[in-house]
C-alpha cells in the first residue's frame, strides 16, 4: 500500500520548504508554496483522503480551477517544521465544482487552513495555466532578504529593477528574460493583492512585493526555487556593489543582445 507521505509531491514540498528555510527566506511562518496536482498524481492516494472533508468558502471566482487538486502549505505553519510533521503543516485541497471554495482532502491534522496568501496563489495559477499552456504548476512566495532590501532603494519600476538584476549576473537574462513585475506595498492576504499579483504574473515569472517578498512560478518546485534563487543571488551582488560605492563597469546593452541571441531568448520590452 502506498503512503501519501512518501509521494513525490509531499516529499517535494518537504524538500522545497526546508531548502527555503535554510536559505533564510522563510522565517517563522513566513512564506507559502502551492503545487497544482493532476488526477494521476493523487489517484493512488485517495483512500487516505478524509471521508467527510471540510469545505472552505472563498470570496474569489476560481471557476477556472474547478475540481483541481493542489498541495499547499498551511497558515501559521513554520517551514522548518514541515520536514518534522508534513501531515500537520501541509494540505491537499480540491477546488469544488462551482469554483466557490475548496475541500481539505488531506493534511492539517491538528486543524487550521491553507496559507492566508491562497487568493494570490489561486489567481496566479489561473493566469500561469493560460500563459504556459498548463506547464506552470508551482507558485512560491518567500521573504528573500536582498530582493526585499532593493525595494527600499531602487525605483519601484519593473524595467529598472529587471535591468539592475540582469546586470549583476550574466545568467539572469537567460533565466528570466520576461523580467520582474513589481507591486507597491499592499495588505497581504487580501483579494486585491491576489488579483494584482496575477495581473503581473501574466507577463512575468517573478513578482516583487515591495517591502515584503517575492512570488515565483515554474513547471516544477525546482524550477520555481531556482528562479527565485537566481534573482536573489543577483540582488545580493547588487546590494554589495551599492555598498561599495556603485558600479564602475557593467554588462552593456549590445552584450545583452548577443547573450539573448546565443541562448534564444527574447528580452522583456523596454529594458534594453
UniProtKB/Swiss-Prot annotation:
Gene3D superfamilies found in the cross-reference section: Class II aldolase/adducin N-terminal domain
Keywords: Cytoplasm, Lyase, Metal-binding, Rhamnose metabolism, Zinc
Annotated metabolic or biological route of this protein: Carbohydrate degradation; L-rhamnose degradation; glycerone phosphate from L-rhamnose: step 3/3
GO terms (BP aspect): pentose catabolic process; rhamnose catabolic process
Gene Ontology MF annotations: metal ion binding; rhamnulose-1-phosphate aldolase activity
Organism superkingdom: Bacteria
Catalytic activity annotation: L-rhamnulose 1-phosphate = (S)-lactaldehyde + dihydroxyacetone phosphate
InterPro entries given in the database record: Aldolase_class_II_sugar_metab (IPR050197), Aldolase_II/adducin_N (IPR001303), Aldolase_II/adducin_N_sf (IPR036409), Rhamnulose-1-P_Aldolase (IPR013447)
Primary location group: cytoplasm
Residues at which Zn(2+) binds: 141, 143, 212
GO cellular component: cytosol
Cofactor or coenzyme needed: Zn(2+)
Subcellular location as annotated: Cytoplasm
Details of cofactor binding: Binds 1 zinc ion per subunit.
Keyword Zinc belongs to the record: yes
EC number(s) stated in the UniProt entry for this protein: 4.1.2.19
Residues at the catalytic site: 117
HAMAP family associated with the record: RhaD
Name of the protein described by the UniProt record: Rhamnulose-1-phosphate aldolase
Species of the source: Mannheimia succiniciproducens (strain KCTC 0769BP / MBEL55E)
